[in-house]
Amino acid sequence: MAGHSKWANTRHRKAAQDAKRGKIFTKIIRELVTAAKLGGGDPDANPRLRAAIDKALSNNMTRDTLNRAIARGVGGDDDANMETIIYEGYGPGGTAIMIECLSDNRNRTVAEVRHAFSKCGGNLGTDGSVAYLFSKKGVISFEKGDEDTIMEAALEAGAEDVVTYDDGAIDVYTAWEEMGKVRDALEAAGLKADSAEVSMIPSTKADMDAETAPKLMRLIDMLEDCDDVQEVYHNGEISDEVAATL
């Protein structure tokens, strides 16, 4: 299946920004602790924990650090008293946006999220307002590789789809609970992915122009700056021409 590099570029940009802010490890550790507390410390029996471990390893977190986080969760660490909250809304240009948070204070979190929307010309919506536009999937990414080899191994392991982008990058899509199993099968076949994460994939896209694209990027930046925000998903699509002006 052919694709475009826009989505890969957006994801890589996001990862670079998180790393620059020094927040990504803090957010991953919080997810590891929470996942272990809610579902136990065995990743084979806890898909959420397995997904968090895959994300930690993709971001070069050491095994020692992630194991300590899991132990904190299993041990009932006070810091694990977090709840997952999903907010939905509309951004510039009618972009559908989903925000995944981990918080111990709903009032604080919703105030920060609402502030970001109000500053950037968006609107915080009600539950279900945009969720129907997204599907939860596992995404295993290769910056480069042989499409036929990866596709054959991935589909044999139970992947749902394989997308090749214009820049040579390849994404393998799976049911989110099966991502760890598929990644293990790919590695057993000698195919080591550059990253693996659970994501919300939009079914439709909203084209961003030179006016709306900067506003959308500002909104995403503000949301990602919130300590309680774990992930921001959107269906905005920015062309290479517009991206070059940002």
From Swiss-Prot:
Top-rank lineage group of the source organism: Bacteria
Molecular function terms from GO: DNA binding
Transferase keyword on record: no
NCBIfam families linked to this entry: PRK00110.1, PRK12378.1, YebC/PmpR family DNA-binding transcriptional regulator
GO cellular component: cytosol
Compartment(s) of residence: Cytoplasm
Upper classification of the organism: Bacteria, Pseudomonadati, Pseudomonadota, Gammaproteobacteria, Enterobacterales
Any one biological process term the GO annotation gives: regulation of DNA-templated transcription
Region (Disordered): 1-20
UniProt keywords, alphabetically: Cytoplasm, DNA-binding, Transcription, Transcription regulation
Family in the record: Belongs to the TACO1 family.
Name of this chain's protein: Probable transcriptional regulatory protein YebC
Gene name tied to this protein: yebC
Native organism: Escherichia coli O6:H1 (strain CFT073 / ATCC 700928 / UPEC)
Major subcellular site: cytoplasm
Listed SUPFAM superfamilies: YebC-like
